[in-house]
Amino acid sequence: SPEGAASILYKDAGQVERAAEALRIVPMNPAQDFFSAVQSVWLMEMILSCVTGGRDFAFSRLDLALLPFFDAAESEDAQEILTEFLLHCNNIGGMGSELHVHMPVPCAATNIYLMLGGRGAEEALALDLCFLRAALEVRLPQPVLALRQCKDSDSRWKIACAHAAQELNGQVSLYNDDALIPNLIALGMPEEKALHYTMSGCNRAET
């Protein structure tokens, strides 16, 4: 039941009811708010991780996908939701070796990549900063934060990225859009796709 599934993830009665209500809608139907959107992403990523072997995957441009549901005026609630989301990303490592008989991956950990910021995501600044604050609360290995910057990046983003890199050590990688995007275009990638590149695997750029 939705209530049973929700109670696995949430202890507070109000959170359980909120999660149960979201599970009546997502992921079968479109999300209706920020909470149900994040819940839908988590459920799909957890299932895909089990099915495909539980090893190295990325959320693509999750900030842009969640942006239509994000209200900067309610960033405190959004940060709490994202904190729970990032915590759960550390619960699914290594399951592929047990659950996928066709492609078992005997790994003790799964690397998950979350790309934030950069060209084409300027309107997501408040949400991206919220993600970083949540990561600083969690301070666990996953997801790996792939933080995009360019010379025109907002100073608040540059400072927040520098702080995250200092505080979270190996969890943060910085990517230079001014170098990567022109090179992706030179390799034949359409400009729109190059603008929204993300990371998959240790250092592979994809769209």
PLM regions: where:
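Conserved catalytic cores of very large enzyme subunits
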Residues: 1-207
